From Swiss-Prot:
Source organism per UniProt: Frankia alni (strain DSM 45986 / CECT 9034 / ACN14a)
Main location: cytoplasm
Enzyme class, broadest EC rank: lyase
Gene Ontology CC, one term: cytoplasm
Role of this protein: Catalyzes a reversible aldol reaction between acetaldehyde and D-glyceraldehyde 3-phosphate to generate 2-deoxy-D-ribose 5-phosphate.
GO MF entries: deoxyribose-phosphate aldolase activity
Name used for this protein in its record: Deoxyribose-phosphate aldolase
CDD domains: DeoC (cd00959)
Length: 227
């Protein structure tokens, strides 16, 4: 794939707890320069990023989409809190929501609870908003990844996503992406996120079935693809 093609698959990400407004603005400026598909920020930075996307574009359309994380990073917020967090993020300008499931439900194989939680968040935002569901796949065997993906699909998600990037168990893996592709490939998007810092690893994820990449080192990764 060419650099520009890969760039459109990237969610350029800044989720550090101490990220400043200045750093978010720098992220957005870099996103516009690189031609990425979206930025991914904390709910408190959505308004700033959404305003920046139009300042970064010379056209009527925004330069990139704005994604907000929800229930991040542990997924243990009450569902009503996640739904309200999603509503407020959309009101501030987010067009994509990356929600963390209650990961214990995936370990306990409580698929109905996962589906219900996702459905409630899905219903809390307009249909045009893209909902991505973070599974924290490093904690799950393949069978649980597959079942969680199917619960996400039943709940109305548009994407499943590997990882928050914050859990010590690890981030995206080829194993997890392949399991996700087995479960919902061709029907839902698959976002690989967490620990992808080289073009080689990005290529591995795309070959395994990823259709979106969550990256903080976007410039370094893109430099490894042909112009």
């Amino acid at each position: 794939m060419r650099r520009a093609e890969v760039a459109r698959l990237i969610d350029h990400t800044l989720l550090a707890p101490a990220a400043t407004d200045e750093e978010v603005l720098a992220l957005c400026a870099e996103a516009a320069r690189l031609g990425v598909g979206a930025v991914c920020v904390a709910p408190t930075h959505v308004y700033l990023a959404a305003a920046s996307t139009y300042r970064s574009s010379h056209e009527a359309e925004p330069a990139f989409a704005v994604a907000s994380v929800i229930g991040f990073p542990h997924g243990t917020h009450l569902t009503v809190i996640k739904a309200e967090e999603a509503r407020r993020a959309v009101a501030d300008g987010a067009t994509e929501i990356d929600m963390v499931i209650d990961i214990a439900n995936a370990l306990d194989e409580n698929w109905r609870a996962i589906e219900t939680e996702i459905s409630e968040v899905r219903l809390s935002v307009p249909p045009h908003v893209i909902l991505k569901v973070i599974l924290e796949t490093a904690l799950l065997p393949d069978a649980n990844i597959i079942a969680a993906c199917r619960a996400a699909e039943a709940g109305g998600a548009e994407f499943v996503k590997t990882s928050t990037g914050f859990h010590p168990a690890g981030g995206a893996s080829v194993r997890a992406v392949r399991a996700m592709a087995e479960a919902v490939g061709g029907r839902l998007g698959i976002k690989a996120s967490g620990g992808i810092r080289t073009a080689e690893k990005a290529k591995d994820m795309l070959e395994a079935g990823a259709t979106r990449l969550g990256l903080s080192a976007s410039a370094d990764v893109l430099a490894g693809f042909p112009a």
